């Protein structure tokens, strides 16, 4: 895997539905019964990671796996169903094989507030070797 491009930026928009909210994330739990119908933190993290994959995956050959190996996340403002988030992803220069660092930010299009930010390290490793080491 070689990345000679300096900084890349990717942006996408996701509309929040009831399925993305706190009561829906773990059906049958106290969280589902008492949680507010706002964008769930776990769902927002998944959206940020998905947007990142849209940027990173095209540069990574199929024989390599991309695995999260560190990160810091902040959920900074609520988002309601029907509202949209614009996700902006940035990646700095990446080594030939190893760790990549990227930052994904979600902004509530309707309120202008930052909804969340994820700073994430991703390791790019040989897929077959990884699964051998994991005993699979």
Please report, for each region that a protein language model flagged, where it lies by residue.
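Catalytic strand-loop segment that frames the active site of acyl-thioester-processing enzymes
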Residues: 2-39
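A generic structural signal for short beta-strands and their flanking turns/coil linkers
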Residues: 8-12, 67-71, 83-87, 98-100, ...
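A structural signal for short, well-ordered beta-strand segments
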Residues: 10-16, 71, 75, 89, ...
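Non-catalytic surface loops within mature trypsin-like serine protease
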Residues: 18-20, 77, 124-126
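A short mixed-secondary-structure module that forms the rim of ligand-binding clefts
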Residues: 41-43
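Hydrophobic beta-strand-centered segment that forms part of the acyl-chain substrate-binding groove
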Residues: 52-86
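HotDog/MaoC-like acyl-thioester-processing domains
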Residues: 80-81, 90-136
């Amino acid at each position: 895997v070689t990345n000679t491009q300096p900084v890349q930026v990717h942006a996408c928009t996701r509309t929040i539905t009831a399925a993305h909210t706190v009561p829906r994330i773990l059906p049958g739990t106290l969280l589902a019964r008492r949680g507010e119908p706002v964008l769930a933190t776990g769902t927002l993290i998944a959206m940020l990671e998905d947007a990142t994959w849209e940027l990173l995956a095209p540069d990574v050959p199929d024989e390599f796996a991309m695995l999260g190996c560190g990160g810091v996340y902040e959920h900074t403002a609520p988002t309601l169903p029907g509202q949209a988030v614009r996700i902006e992803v940035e990646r700095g220069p990446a080594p030939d094989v190893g760790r990549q660092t990227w930052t994904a930010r979600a902004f509530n299009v309707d309120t202008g507030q930052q909804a969340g930010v994820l700073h994430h390290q991703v390791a790019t490793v040989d897929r077959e070797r990884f699964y051998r080491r994991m005993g699979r």
